């Protein structure tokens, strides 16, 4: 993923409200949202090239998502696949707390990334690029609205701030059906003003192109928007909208399930 905004235990009906965009090169093969053949309890898209995923959930309510940390130097070809951080959790039996503890040692071996791992009890954020921490940063998150892109959690990049404000306003409006509104905030193609752009080591032109929540460019852009809603009673709705290289919507998928009691 390249943009994730979420409300954790901050809504009277939903324990989790999450909206995310996946940005990727268009020639990298991937599978759309579905249950996995090799792990039938896991629901998510999948990276065909490496076998991992950017965002997935288990029917027991555990979920995870990863974003790359933007750096001027591309990841080395031998780097461990960051998508396996997500698949390794949702295909396991570990709780969020257990996985966050266990991942702290190997996480620095991966290229720059951020990881969210959650279950019904807790939500953890992990990063291997926070210079204030030796090795990995592991943090248990408090209830509230958070945003994550290709830097650290809640870094005030324009698109993160914009989408967090939109999510907070949506939650405050008290609407019962919010999926379309979440997809609307993810569909924003407005770039940030030049004076607001972060300096991440890429060219000014690319920095501006990457600054909108929804990205359209030749060969690279937003390939999927995903919404996950988890009711307080355990009903989970995961929705995905897929896009082509021109930003035109290609498909929609919705999966609904009731969280099992196997773990939570």
Label the model's feature ranges.
Residues 1-264:
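N-terminal nucleophile
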């Amino acid at each position: 993923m390249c943009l994730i905004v979420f409300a954790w235990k901050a809504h009277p009906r939903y324990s989790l409200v999450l909206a995310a965009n996946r940005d990727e090169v268009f020639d990298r093969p991937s599978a759309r949202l579905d249950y996995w053949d090799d792990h039938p309890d896991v629901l998510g898209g999948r990276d065909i090239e490496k076998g991992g995923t950017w965002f997935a959930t288990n029917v027991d309510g555990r979920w995870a998502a990863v974003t790359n940390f933007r750096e001027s130097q591309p990841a080395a070809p031998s780097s461990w696949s960051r998508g396996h951080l997500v698949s390794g959790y949702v295909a396991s039996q570990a709780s969020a707390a257990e996985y966050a503890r266990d991942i702290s040692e190997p996480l620095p071996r991966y290229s720059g990334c951020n990881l969210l791992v959650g279950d019904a009890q807790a939500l953890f954020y992990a990063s291997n690029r926070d210079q204030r921490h030796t090795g990995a940063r592991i943090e248990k998150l408090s209830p509230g609205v958070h945003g994550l892109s290709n830097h650290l959690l809640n870094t005030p990049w324009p698109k993160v701030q914009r989408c967090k404000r939109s999510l907070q306003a949506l939650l405050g409006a008290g609407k019962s059906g919010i999926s379309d509104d979440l997809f609307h905030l993810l569909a924003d193609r407005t770039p940030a003003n030049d004076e607001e752009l972060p300096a991440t080591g890429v060219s000014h032109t690319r920095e501006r192109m990457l600054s909108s929540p929804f990205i359209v460019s030749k060969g690279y852009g937003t390939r999927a928007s995903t919404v996950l809603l988890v009711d307080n009673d355990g009903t989970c709705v995961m929705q995905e909208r897929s896009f082509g290289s021109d930003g035109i919507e290609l498909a929609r998928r919705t999966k609904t399930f009731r969280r099992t009691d196997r773990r939570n």
